[in-house]
Amino acid sequence: MHLSRYIAVLLSASSFVSALPLQNDVISDDGSKPIDAIMATAMEHKVVNPENLDATPATPENPEDLDKRFYYTGYKRNAETPEDLDKRFYYTGYKRNAETPEDLDKRFYYTGYKRNAETPEDLDKRFYYTGYKRNAETPEDLDKRFYYTGYKRNAETPEDLDKRFYYTGYKRNAETPDDLDKRFYYTGYKRNAETPDDLDKRFYYTGYKRNAETPEDLDKRFYYTGYKRNAETPEDLDKRFYYTGYKRNAETPEDLDKRFYYTGYKRNAETPEDLDK
């Protein structure tokens, strides 16, 4: 009785042990400790989708952040040239690290990029107003280039434009310095620190005249203001004007004759005797 009972207990224990897995069949990666075979089996059958790993990043990234991140590393879309890449990012306002918005505009201007619906002329105007210039172009060159194409500063009339360029000595194409002087004289412009009288004198010496003014009118106008020709004394001035019949203001012909008689002047084809008579 006791023996049969003891045998039954042994058989029961043996069946329980045989049901357990062999623990030395599965060990950890470093070989230091066994892994439960049930857990190992579960791990072998678990399938992890890589897309699921990217589906929930630590910090969600919007499309703009994605574009920026790839732009900084130089990635581009398929069939997209480096120039296309630059253009695409320029239109969305991205910039290189340590690059100000002004630097961005300059960089794209030099490569000829422009804003949407902006003509080349609009591009030039936009950059002129902000003071950008072409390579190896001085500020004076910049002014000249824009003057020739008719651009002007804000709140500047065409007359203001002409004056500004006249003071710096610019001229129109196929226009000589004399043509420049004439054009500005007719519109009343003058040189810096030059009075209206200085202006008249300068133009008188070079023979310029006012519109609808004959050479005689020119002589009269200058005589009344006391101007004279180069290397001409006051006496020479009086003689020249006497012979042509000019007189001083508020002076009668008799006064004119008296003045010239006292100084010994005479009319052409008149002898000293005729003068005395």
Curated annotation (Swiss-Prot):
Propeptide segments, given as residue ranges: 20-69, 76-88, 95-107, 114-126, 133-145, 152-164, 171-183, 190-202, 209-221, 228-240, 247-259, 266-277
UniProt keyword annotation of Signal present: yes
Signal peptide feature range: 1-19
Domain of life: Eukaryota
Keyword Ligase: no
Alphabetical keyword list: Signal
Pathway assigned to this chain's UniProt record: Secondary metabolite biosynthesis
Function: Ribosomally synthesized cyclic peptide asperipin-2a precursor; part of the gene cluster that mediates the biosynthesis of the asperipin-2a, a bicyclic peptide that possesses two macrocyclic ether rings consisting of 14- and 17-membered paracyclophans. The aprA translated product contains a 11-fold repeated peptide embedding the hexapeptide Phe-Tyr-Tyr-Thr-Gly-Tyr, that is converted into asperipin-2a. After being excised from the precursor peptide by kexin proteases, the core peptides are cyclized and modified post-translationally by enzymes encoded within the corresponding gene cluster.
Protein name: Ribosomally synthesized cyclic peptide asperipin-2a precursor aprA
Native source species: Aspergillus flavus (strain ATCC 200026 / FGSC A1120 / IAM 13836 / NRRL 3357 / JCM 12722 / SRRC 167)
Gene, per the UniProt record: aprA
